Amino acid sequence: MARLAAFDMDGTLLMPDHHLGEKTLSTLARLRERDITLTFATGRHALEMQHILGALSLDAYLITGNGTRVHSLEGELLHRDDLPADVAELVLYQQWDTRASMHIFNDDGWFTGKEIPALLQAFVYSGFRYQIIDVKKMPLGSVTKICFCGDHDDLTRLQIQLYEALGERAHLCFSATDCLEVLPVGCNKGAALTVLTQHLGLSLRDCMAFGDAMNDREMLGCVGSGFIMGNAMPQLRAELPHLPVIGHCRNQAVSHYLTHWLDYPHLPYSPE
């Protein structure tokens, strides 16, 4: 029996309308009744996730910013990882050949240079939103991550530019087809989950995890039981071909799988 369950949010636990379904909430409560530790592992900000947990009265550990922060049930900071100031400076000040919008994160929130109302649709559940700033005046010593949002083909070309400029000084990953992230070296959900399990005295073999994008790759690959969403990025399936694929997030597939796991643990599972 797994002792910890780690969940990506967007494309995994959240439905396409960016809400948690009632079946999902019920299943999370059942896991807690079985003393299974809940962990939300997401690219979203800690401030937003703490608000969501409070609104839903959920007890869960948080891995946020794609591994840049880990918080306890009580909100205590257990782990932090920031971009080096010189890396943040290069990414913020360089003129990149891209149409993508740039977004900067630190402990105070989410910052960008202009209004992009369409991006806020993903945050209707929490009401979290960006702050408009002059990105050139952003303090460089406290940046957790920098994201670029736009067309996937454009972001793929940008990824090449970033690799050429940064080399091994940052970790680049797609958290969605339309979002490319610049993270500290060695920073990912899997590394953060390793820190958390050590804090809890658990083994990664004691964990299960669910995800749909390339920022979930390390986490899904390091746990005892990793599960890929039916709506996952093709690149993730190709990277982890040995992992089982469950259903689509629109059908609350995580809840569907876990209900079977809780009620019929010895029977084979079908996502249909």
Curated annotation (Swiss-Prot):
<feature type="active site" description="Nucleophile">
    <location>
        <position position="8"/>
    </location>
</feature>
<comment type="function">
    <text>Catalyzes the hydrolysis of 4-amino-2-methyl-5-hydroxymethylpyrimidine pyrophosphate (HMP-PP) to 4-amino-2-methyl-5-hydroxymethylpyrimidine phosphate (HMP-P).</text>
</comment>
<dbReference type="InterPro" id="IPR036412">
    <property type="entry name" value="HAD-like_sf"/>
</dbReference>
<dbReference type="InterPro" id="IPR023214">
    <property type="entry name" value="HAD_sf"/>
</dbReference>
<keyword id="KW-0460">Magnesium</keyword>
<dbReference type="GO" id="GO:0002145">
    <property type="term" value="F:4-amino-5-hydroxymethyl-2-methylpyrimidine diphosphatase activity"/>
</dbReference>
<feature type="binding site">
    <location>
        <position position="10"/>
    </location>
    <ligand>
        <name>Mg(2+)</name>
    </ligand>
</feature>
<dbReference type="InterPro" id="IPR023938">
    <property type="entry name" value="HMP-PP_phosphatase"/>
</dbReference>
<dbReference type="InterPro" id="IPR006379">
    <property type="entry name" value="HAD-SF_hydro_IIB"/>
</dbReference>
<dbReference type="GO" id="GO:0000287">
    <property type="term" value="F:magnesium ion binding"/>
</dbReference>
<keyword id="KW-0479">Metal-binding</keyword>
<feature type="binding site">
    <location>
        <position position="8"/>
    </location>
    <ligand>
        <name>Mg(2+)</name>
    </ligand>
</feature>
<keyword id="KW-0378">Hydrolase</keyword>
<dbReference type="GO" id="GO:0016791">
    <property type="term" value="F:phosphatase activity"/>
</dbReference>
<dbReference type="Pfam" id="PF08282">
    <property type="entry name" value="Hydrolase_3"/>
</dbReference>
<feature type="binding site">
    <location>
        <position position="212"/>
    </location>
    <ligand>
        <name>Mg(2+)</name>
    </ligand>
</feature>
<protein>
    <recommendedName>
        <fullName>HMP-PP phosphatase</fullName>
        <ecNumber>3.6.1.-</ecNumber>
    </recommendedName>
</protein>
<dbReference type="InterPro" id="IPR000150">
    <property type="entry name" value="Cof"/>
</dbReference>
<comment type="similarity">
    <text>Belongs to the HAD-like hydrolase superfamily. Cof family.</text>
</comment>
